[in-house]
């Protein structure tokens, strides 16, 4: 679902922000 994809993308962005 779009909501799930958005949540997953937000999580990925958060992780990447911490890495870089």
From Swiss-Prot:
<keyword id="KW-0964">Secreted</keyword>
<keyword id="KW-0561">Oxygen transport</keyword>
<comment type="similarity">
    <text>Belongs to the tyrosinase family. Hemocyanin subfamily.</text>
</comment>
<protein>
    <recommendedName>
        <fullName>Hemocyanin subunit 6</fullName>
    </recommendedName>
</protein>
<keyword id="KW-0813">Transport</keyword>
<dbReference type="GO" id="GO:0005344">
    <property type="term" value="F:oxygen carrier activity"/>
</dbReference>
<keyword id="KW-0186">Copper</keyword>
<comment type="function">
    <text>Hemocyanins are copper-containing oxygen carriers occurring freely dissolved in the hemolymph of many mollusks and arthropods.</text>
</comment>
<dbReference type="GO" id="GO:0005576">
    <property type="term" value="C:extracellular region"/>
</dbReference>
